[in-house]
Amino acid sequence: MSPDYLAVGHVTEDLWRDGRITPGGTAWFASLAARRMVDRVSVLTAAAPTYDAERHLPGIFVHRIESPTTTQFENIYTPGGRIQYTRPSPVRLEPRHLTDALRNARIMHLAPVCDEVSPDFVAEARPDVFIGVTPQGWLRRWDETGRVYAKPWDAAPQVLARADAAVISIDDVAGDWRLALTWAAQARLFVVTEGASGCTLFLAGKPYHIPAPSVSEVDPTGAGDIFAATLFIALQRGLHPLEACAFACCVASQSVTRASLDSLPTPEDLAQCSTIAKRWARVAGHPH
């Protein structure tokens, strides 16, 4: 049976200065969030045989391409900002890795973390598949030591021409709104998340700001992945983009009030945020 939601991207191992290794990656966190909203969730990824998919992705079908290693990330925080290192899996994910069932997913979320997802997925996707993209990993390159730097997103025109929705954080482009606006002009629907300030939706190039509820932040980890998964599902279900963005903003805001996997959406979050989003959309003049 085909999944309701398919995330395509490397799952990761995140290394910490105290020696801990924790699971990570947009495909990992977004799929766990999606599982709170839909029944059938799958992940297409590449990882070493030692990666414990049953433990890290319970209730999710994992189609794992064999890899000698699992992609690793290490973040080092300095007074001058964050320095990031990666040791990526050498396996690039291509459309040929899709099974017939995965090819027929209702939603395909392209979720690269280190330029490992081929942009050809958009060209080969069935026309009735909702394509959501979080291009963060297409914006990264690294040197021989693994230190991560920014790079141009050369495939942006190709990807955005087909994608039903794309989401970036303003931090992904180091605050460069000019670059974000360039991509927004090429997209059907483009969202820039702005942390506690909410997000800006570009619909056919026109901007709409959606505020986030005021909350007490405990842990922001994964909030962007939760936002993207929630948004893609809401849009695929037919919500007006403004209501869908308000819903996703609310769910992501609730997630930062809890730590680790406790940040995943609860039934109470989803019900409360659905009501809030409907009310906000009515006030904004876009009920559906």
Language model segments and positions:
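Conserved N-terminal subdomain of the carbohydrate kinase-like
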Residues: 2-7, 13-21, 36-132, 272-288
